[in-house]
């Protein structure tokens, strides 16, 4: 049974999103001090986020980039303005993205 996400889960999933590119590099160059379970967990996260991104519409991909992957940190207000949506809609889209990531990485 899949449990619903709570206030503790979202920051963890957001950290996965922010650290995605670093995790990809670690995954590609498996450190010798990483055990198999850690590596399998990392693989699940990397492949799950990649799948969510690739399966998303271009507008959603842009939200992912602006929210979590750009070096410059944009506020929700700026991202919503750039995307032509309300901040409420942006927050909803981000929540949906994180739920998709949670499912794709077997978080829940």
Residue ranges and their predicted role:
Residues 1-55, 78, 105-108:
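N-terminal interaction/assembly modules
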Residues 24, 72-74, 101:
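A short hydrophobic/aromatic micro-motif that marks alpha-helical segments and, especially, helix-coil
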Residues 63-64:
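A short pre-motif secondary-structure segment
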Residues 67-68:
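Short helix-to-turn junction characteristic of helix-turn-helix DNA-binding domains
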Residues 71-86:
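Helix-turn-helix DNA-binding module
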Residues 84-106:
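DNA-recognition helix of helix-turn-helix
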């Amino acid at each position: 049974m899949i449990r619903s996400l709570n206030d503790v889960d979202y920051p963890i999933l957001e950290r996965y999103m922010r650290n995605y590119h670093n995790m990809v590099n670690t995954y590609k160059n498996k450190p010798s001090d990483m055990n198999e379970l850690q590596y399998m967990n990392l693989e699940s996260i990397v492949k799950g986020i990649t799948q969510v991104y690739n399966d998303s519409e271009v507008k959603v991909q842009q939200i992912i980039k602006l929210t979590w992957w750009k070096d410059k940190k944009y506020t929700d207000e700026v991202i919503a303005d750039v995307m032509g949506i309300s901040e409420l809609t942006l927050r909803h889209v981000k929540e949906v993205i994180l739920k998709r990531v949670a499912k794709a990485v077997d978080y829940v």
